[in-house]
Amino acid sequence: MKKITILFLNVIFVNLLFSNSFKLHLLFTNNIHGAIHEVPARFINPEFSPILAGGAGAFTYASKLRKEAKLKEDFVMLTDAGNIFQGSQLGTYDGGSNIIKWMNWMAYDAIVPGVRDFDQGANNLSKLASEANFPFIASNLEGVDGIEDYKIINANGVKIGLIGLITPFISEGLLPEYYEGVAVSDIMKTLGTQIEKIRDEVDLIFVLSHLG
């Protein structure tokens, strides 16, 4: 049986050194809540808050890192762990489509939906998945069209499996009609099933989760 390294994506920036001496840069976002505009960082200094550069700044950083990585024959993987649009007027007025446009511009590799991504219903979540140039992955989520179990990425010859998992508590804080027909299966049982499904196809497995 093939031995697989399994890692949970729970850090912001990580570099991993593989045996063939290239770096895998993991870029990770979470709880964007539609805030891709410039916003004051009141958590740093409530009286004299520096301005966070927002989506444009994130694009500049990711583009710079990808350019540098390409020159060194390294690889950049960009993922998100959900709650992408609810929380700002920019995000909510069109159900998150503007945020998906930005994420397409950023060239995300995959995202796992969060609880707040159901705020305009499961059909809206399916619509967002159809608008994205990258997969929405949540292997334990049932009843939502367009959601995939996993994604396999070829990173300079190293095959990486991304398995998505979502919290079973999606009903908390949501109107019942927003998750009607939706079910979430057991996290660990589903994870074991997905690992067995892809372990012979990949060298590394990352778990991209929204479990908080």
Across the structure, where does each feature detected by a protein language model lie?
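Acidic, metal/ion-coordinating pockets
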Residues: S19-G212
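Sec-dependent N-terminal signal peptides
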Residues: I4-V14
